[in-house]
A protein has these predicted regions:
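Conserved, structured core segments of small domains
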Residues: 1-93
Length: 93
């Protein structure tokens, strides 16, 4: 199942710099693990924002929820999810 996910990060301005560095490092490691596993095949930065657009390829809604809630930055994110379906006009490759 494919999902289009927008993640907007809102870290507190008064967050301790060492805490911020740690959480960002853990986020990078976890997201790269999911990318290597093929569950997070596309990741793009939104220009000028601390946000991204991603495509997840997972087996179920529950699996996606588990992966997203496991992100170290999850408590600081606004996340919007759109399930995707194959378009009938897509060129077959």
């Amino acid at each position: 199942m494919l999902f289009h996910v927008r993640m907007d990060v809102r870290l507190p301005s008064d967050m301790d710099p060492s805490v911020r560095a740690d959480i960002v490092a853990r986020e990078k490691a976890y997201s790269q693990q999911l990318q290597r596993e093929g569950k997070w095949p596309h990741l793009w930065r939104i220009v000028g924002e601390y946000s991204n657009i991603s495509i997840f390829d997972v087996g179920s809604n529950d699996e996606l929820h588990e992966l997203l809630s496991g992100l170290p930055l999850f408590p600081y994110m606004d996340i919007r999810v759109m399930p995707l379906a194959t378009h009938p006009s897509k060129v077959v490759e």
